[in-house]
Amino acid sequence: MSTPRGSSAYVRGVVDVSIVVPACFENPLKEEAIDFLSAVLVQEVPAKIPVTAILGAYHIATRYIRAPREAVKNVLSSLLRTRSPAFFPDVSPYLAIEALRYAADFHIESWDGYLVALALFLGTNTIYSLDKELSRVSHVRVVIPFPEDKIREYHEYISALRHSPT
């Protein structure tokens, strides 16, 4: 049996965009996000980062958080330039169909459905995420890889950013 493109022999989890976004701009969770992503990139944490999560992080960081585009581009490009085996490059029609099925069945976003489909495809049930909505999927385990106090600070920081005048 061959392994899927972008996979390794053992995958512990799949990384959600919500873990990548804090690495893109100054915030209380930035260092923890960089440390965790670094561990994934060198496979100390055997997980996959969908390349689509990098694109999604750019969208979220620049559009919703209004982080500087050039700085976000540089951070995300530097992650990709590592050419780490942690990156999962493909969204196959099979995974897209499964993603849509999970999204419809569990009333989650299609992107979250893709994370579920990818995790199960890779033989794991763990998704590293700040998104508790993923817990709706009973056979998936959501792991938040950061300390609770830092997450609280991050959410307060983001809330203040979003409510501040431009």
Task: Go through each PLM region and give its residues.
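Short secondary-structure boundary segments
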Residues: 51-52, 131-132
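Short active-site oxyanion
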Residues: 43-47, 85-87, 121-126
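Acidic, metal-associated active-site segment
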Residues: 17, 109-126
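Acidic catalytic patch
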Residues: 51, 80-104
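Helix-adjacent hinge/juxtasegments
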Residues: 60-91
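Short loop/helix-cap segments at secondary-structure boundaries that form the rim of catalytic
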Residues: 134-140
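Short, well-structured N-terminal submotif of metal-dependent ribonuclease cores
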Residues: 1-49, 67-73, 151-166
